[in-house]
Amino acid sequence: MALIQVNYLSKVLFRTVPVNVILPSDKISFETLDYQGVPDGGYPTLFLLHGLLGNYTDWVSGTRIQRWAEDAGLAVVMPSGDNAFYIPGLAANSDYGAFVGEELPRVMRTMFPLSRRREDTFIAGLSMGGFGTLRNGMKYAETFSHLAAFSSGIHFFDPNYESLAGEESVFGDLAEAAKTDKSHYVVFEQLKARVAAGEVEAPKFWMSCGTEDSLMPVNLKFRDMLIDAGFDVTWDEEPRGHDWDFWDSQIKKVIDWLPLGEADATLGSGNVSRDL
């Protein structure tokens, strides 16, 4: 399993940005004792978003994503969201939505042997990244076939919500932002219309939240909206809070949920047995 740090000049953000990439390029077959090589069409790819206060290193340091991605033959791309909620910000060169939904897949596919097929391209995230997953996974549904949102911070547009993390510096006035596609509710309505018109295929959703998490009610509310609209939604909950123990468990479940097929057992560091 290769863990690669990339720094590239983002046209959208107009600066150099860091990205971590997990690439299962060094898997050695037990049968041939040689590298397996790139699958036909390239590696299926998960774009994985961190939460507030985090960066592109969070998922590697907080979970066992490397082990599970290697086992599944899955490439994982982890950008930095810079507390920007993965939306078009107020400042110039701050459209983090277009960065995640358009530019990042295109650039990563030019650098690495990643599949360009929608059915092999997925997006997931936690907390702020869960919001970014829902908003951008729906907005760019022509790119992403499966969305997985953990403990999603989708409470910004609740009139009873008190801003605690400087959200208005990114969204602007929340009442006004709620009327635009910065809101996942607006993008949800747009997606329903696009699917009904046959313009895009509906993505599949995984949503989850810890039962001890204060974000549970708003996540249940949005889950029910998706189900009522006829979307394919898998829901999961565990007796946990807003923490890495929950997200570590969830990312393994989601990798198992994704349409990846059966991966062959391979030889690797610390993994020398066929009995996997």
Residue ranges of each PLM-predicted region?
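Non-catalytic cap/lid and distal C-terminal segments of serine-dependent acyl enzymes
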Residues: 1-276
